Amino acid sequence: MSKSDHFLVINGKNCCVFRDENIAKVLPPVLGLEFVFGLLGNGLALWIFCFHLKSWKSSRIFLFNLAVADFLLIICLPFLTDNYVHNWDWRFGGIPCRVMLFMLAMNRQGSIIFLTVVAVDRYFRVVHPHHFLNKISNRTAAIISCFLWGLTIGLTVHLLYTNMMTKNGEAYLCSSFSICYNFRWHDAMFLLEFFLPLAIILFCSGRIIWSLRQRQMDRHAKIKRAINFIMVVAIVFIICFLPSVAVRIRIFWLLYKYNVRNCDIYSSVDLAFFTTLSFTYMNSMLDPVVYYFSSPSFPNFFSTCINRCLRKKTLGEPDNNRSTSVELTGDPSTTRSIPGALMADPSEPGSPPYLASTSR
């Protein structure tokens, strides 16, 4: 196959573009599952945040913004799936193409940023329980969240004013990750948004685990399970994002070495990149697990709902008037998830005394 078979000029840059039929066969089912489970999980999380939380704390504000970012990313997946199903033939026009790519990039980056903020918040609450950052007001947390959203939009807004749709034979290509002989801002952000948060998450997770072991808390079986959860969060982040980043770096190396003189050498890495890129959306699908274990509100809510259903079934009693939202304020009589006890704000009712009383 000659260079011209896959060669395409995009915005004045020489690029290699592929329309691999394997993408149309493999990725739509994967994205479909991510969409369904991600929509259910994040939609339920937002519903609980909006209608069943009676009190707000800074940590919950950060979790809420994480849920918003994940939800906005997930709702873009049907359009991306349609693009893959039609073998890289975008059918919705130039402006929708820009909006979709912007939403995917902005909310992927926003999701990573707020997941990192949650990790930092847990770090200060467990390792430095008396630090002034643990006492920031809801207003300050909201201002920080607005600043982070502004930063995220500023780093990805170029996708809105750049023409992202290119005629490719009989099809219209809509992609922000074509293989072009130039290192773009978008590529730099794709790498930075992984390595910097990864370093922060690993540092925070490691310090939390080390701090608990120094206090000899890790001998407790329940704390061991909580520590395992912290490690799982970091591992899932790596599994979701590292493969696509590694393949992208490989593409940069090939471009540095061979330019785009022969597009055939990029065929396999192009397929590998878009396959692994679909794994990054899995992180947004799995983030509701973080919400569940990071706040007593979620396990309390589900426990209350299950207890009500069981009570109705077994006793046939009418539902009482006690509001579910009261349960979410942290009723001390409610048994919480043990991993949540470690990850939650020590000042919340229901948090274990060995976290709240630590003064080191």
Swiss-Prot record:
Reported phenotype of the disruption mutant: Niacin administration has no effect on serum adiponectin levels in contrast to wild-type mice where levels are decreased.
Bilayer-spanning residue ranges: 31-51, 61-81, 99-119, 141-161, 190-210, 227-247, 271-291
A GO MF term: nicotinic acid receptor activity
Family affiliation: Belongs to the G-protein coupled receptor 1 family.
First-listed, main subcellular location of the protein, grouped into a coarse class: membrane
GO cellular component: membrane; plasma membrane
The name this protein goes by in its record: Hydroxycarboxylic acid receptor 2
Matches recorded under Pfam families: 7tm_1 (PF00001)
Cytoplasmic face residues: 52-60, 120-140, 211-226, 292-360
Protein task: Acts as a high affinity receptor for both nicotinic acid (also known as niacin) and (D)-beta-hydroxybutyrate and mediates increased adiponectin secretion and decreased lipolysis through G(i)-protein-mediated inhibition of adenylyl cyclase. This pharmacological effect requires nicotinic acid doses that are much higher than those provided by a normal diet. Mediates nicotinic acid-induced apoptosis in mature neutrophils.
Lipid bilayer topology: Multi-pass membrane protein
Biased composition (Polar residues): 321-337
GO BP field: apoptotic process; G protein-coupled receptor signaling pathway; negative regulation of lipid catabolic process; positive regulation of adiponectin secretion; positive regulation of neutrophil apoptotic process
Region (Disordered): 320-360
S-S bridge residues: C97-C174
Keywords: Apoptosis, Cell membrane, Disulfide bond, G-protein coupled receptor, Membrane, Phosphoprotein, Receptor, Transducer, Transmembrane, Transmembrane helix
Gene3D superfamilies on file: Rhodopsin 7-helix transmembrane proteins
Cell compartment(s), UniProt: Cell membrane
Tissue expression summary: Expressed in lungs, spleen, heart, skeletal muscle and adipose tissue.
Extracellular membrane side: 1-30, 82-98, 162-189, 248-270
InterPro entries: GPCR_Rhodpsn (IPR000276), GPCR_Rhodpsn_7TM (IPR017452), HCARs (IPR051893)
Induction section of the entry: By interferon-gamma in macrophages.
Keyword Cell membrane part of the UniProt annotation: yes
Residues bearing PTM Phosphoserine: S325
